[in-house]
A protein has these predicted regions:
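Low-complexity, S/T/G/P-rich flexible repeat/linker segments used as non-globular hinges
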Residues: 119-143
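Short amphipathic secondary-structure patches
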Residues: 49-112
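Residue-level preference for non-acidic, small/hydrophobic
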Residues: 45, 111, 134-136
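Short secondary-structure transition/capping segments
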Residues: 2-8, 96-105, 136-143
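Alpha-helical assembly-interface signal, strongest on the long, hydrophobic N-terminal helix that forms
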Residues: 2-76
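Generic short beta-strand segments
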Residues: 113-119
Length: 143
């Protein structure tokens, strides 16, 4: 069968497509999906930060001028992160709030999210996570 140059050339191109080009195309699509998911995580984190910034304990702020979040801030932030992640939840990627912190100097609330993005890649790549952080300003100047 492999007595001509054409047969060798055909076999070489079949091997090249099978082992080089097709896996590279699959990875390129996966990386594109990853960056889209990353942008979605930052959008979700911004929504979660805005929601958490609404959960300021007003009585504590009036007494001490310190921003303290209510205990419900984590749950509200988690709910708003889920509301703003349609692309992710459509692919069974569920962002979860990993941290909420308050910067007293700038009066900003920061929310960090993390999700397992392994479903965007082939099965040999597991443990791929995507992170996002959002910020919102707690505007309490009129109080």
């Amino acid at each position: 069968m492999l007595h001509s140059r054409k047969a060798y050339s055909t076999l070489w191109w079949i091997g090249y497509y099978t082992f080089c080009l097709i896996p590279l195309m699959v990875m390129a699509v996966g990386i594109g999906r990853y960056f889209y998911a990353r942008a979605e995580m930052f959008k979700s984190a911004d929504g979660a930060a805005l929601a958490a910034a609404q959960e300021v304990d007003v009585v504590t702020y009036l007494n001490t001028k310190q921003i303290v979040l209510l205990p419900s801030a984590y749950g509200v932030a988690q709910a708003y992160a889920a509301y703003n992640s349609d692309y992710l939840t459509g692919r069974r990627i569920y962002p979860r709030v990993t941290a909420i912190r308050v910067d007293q100097a700038t009066k900003k609330v920061y929310v960090s999210l993390r999700a397992d993005a392994s479903s965007l890649f082939p099965s040999i790549l597991r443990g791929v996570t995507v992170n996002g952080e959002g910020e919102a300003e707690a505007r309490l100047g009129s109080l």
